[in-house]
Amino acid sequence: HLYRRRQRQMCIRDRYIVGTPIGNLSDLSYRAINVLKNVSQIACEDTRQTAKIMSKYNFKNHLISFNKNNSFQKIPSIIKKLNEGQSFALVSDAGMPSICDPGEDLIKEARSNGLPVICIPGPCAAITALVTSGLPSSKFIFQGFLPKKPSERREILLAISRYENTTIIFESPHRLKKLLYELKEYCGGDREIRVSREL
């Protein structure tokens, strides 16, 4: 009981980013579970996804929807709560927050307000895909999602065609075929490609 009280006290005024499972809910660390149980509130992309984690590990907490559609409206109120001393955890639907999601903007704003953030490491889809690909992994480039605007997309694809290092790209399933055709067009047919999903 004393150990639990000390853990709870550690969370009273802290800000966390917490890595969540990218496919298997059992991949959540003990430390991550403890933080998510004890912070005042959790900001998450989709409350339904985070609710699955809480159900799996039998705890409840106050969830705040924080995603690309509402992040700029939510950031000021979240920073206000943090300045008032409330503890807070930021999670994404899967993997580490701030990689291709609006968590990046929240963390930047927190730090500019003198509110350092503690990272609770967890699974990362990009690194998991890289290390299981069989492609060179000592040096790599993370590209994330490519721009949708045609001119910007062409510019990035041309840059990728010149990269010598392994390049990691995110893409949604329904746009994957188009991306593969584009990569063949810009990079040629002799470039090795690995497709990873359900990591």
Which stretches of residues belong to each language-model region?
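Single conserved hydrophobic/aromatic residue that forms the stacking wall/gate
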Residues: 1-12
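Loop/turn-to-beta-strand initiation segments
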Residues: 15, 85-89, 165-166
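Short glycine-rich anion-binding loops that position phosphate/pyrophosphate groups of nucleotides
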Residues: 22-23, 93-97, 173-175
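A short beta-strand/loop micro-motif in the catalytic core of glycosyltransferases
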Residues: 40-46
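Conserved helicase motor
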Residues: 66-72, 146-149
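Short glycine-cluster motifs
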Residues: 83-143
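A short, charged helix-loop
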Residues: 141-162
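A contiguous loop/helix-start segment that scaffolds small-molecule binding in enzyme catalytic cores
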Residues: 165-166, 170-199
